[in-house]
Amino acid sequence: VAVYTHLGAEDLARLIAKYDAGRLVSAKGIAEGVSNSNWLIETTQARYILTMYERRIELADLPFFLALLDHLSEAGCPVPRTIHDRSGAPFRMVGEKAAALIEFLPGVSPTTPDPDQARAVGSALAQIHLAAGSFAMSRPNDLGPQQTSAILHECGADALASIDPNLPRILDVATGIARNWPNDLPLSIIHSDLFPDNVLMLGDRVTGMIDFYFACTGAMAYDLAVTHAAWCFDRSGMHLNQALGAALVEGYDSVRPLNKSERDHLPLLAQGACLRFIASRAQDWLDTPADALVRRKDPMDFVHRLEFYRDKGQSAFS
């Protein structure tokens, strides 16, 4: 999450007044991530997160994302609900940009997760996959291996080399992953971006899973592979915490056991997960305005992960 758009106190107060959410007391911009502008809102009634959609998120997709939050919340998943305005609308337009008010959930994102926390996250992810099975809407994955391979090739070898001289080597790898991608694994709505900073915890209990703005219809095992890649390595992406990875998969299996095909495909799915983050990070690195209040993230961290999964295969998950 990040702050691209700057709204004054009067603008924010006017917006909050459209909701039955109390009067604005304070608003604090949150400066992390790259896709939206976010504020922590405190009113006379409660705390909320206000999100303004800046990049990647199409207006036509917002009803899907926000209805999904409501569906999962109503199913008992640790997911924040959308706060609808006085007219019942799940989002409002502020100028040419859409903004939504989201329930604030307690908890903190784990910076150095332990196996008990990873196990709880695996269980919560499986719970979401099962609950999403009855969600009436669908959305294609626009960041699957075919698309992310295309993004990297559109960036081009020269631009990728300007980020890191070793990055262009990923182009041939991307083509191979896209060519071998499985299309017959069990599907549901998946989160597809479940990094530790998108999970809130109190101790080893998951209190919130947030930022569903890459959610789509996809292979459930791919979502587990995304989470494995996001949670179980050190910052460099060179060293896997095997105990963390085993606990994550055990937690998932305890709620929704993987079938043999899903388990066999985990190494390739994880490489595809890494490819997705390499592509989005490279694109963000090249496109992010110099004066934006954001941190640029190094795509090489996920090149190292991808190479690990390619070298270790199934042993990365045992």
Briefly describe each language-model feature range.
Residues V1-R86, L202-R205, S315-F317:
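Conserved NTP-binding catalytic cores of kinases and kinase-like/nucleotidyltransferase enzymes
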Residues L7-Y19, A136-S138, I151-S192, L202:
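An alpha-helical support segment within catalytic cores of ATP-dependent transferases
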Residues A31-T44, I49-L50, T82, T175-Y222, ...:
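Active-site acidic catalytic loop and adjacent metal/ATP-binding pocket
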Residues T43-M137:
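ATP-binding pocket architecture of kinase catalytic cores
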Residues T111-P165, L185-L187, T217, L293-R296:
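A cross-family kinase active-site recognition segment
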Residues D142, Q146, E154, D158, ...:
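ATP/Mg2+ or Mg2+-diphosphate-binding catalytic cores
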Residues A221-P257, Q271-P289:
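Active-site activation/catalytic loop segments of kinase-like enzymes and analogous catalytic loops
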Residues L258-A270:
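All-alpha amphipathic helical-bundle segments outside canonical DNA-binding/catalytic cores
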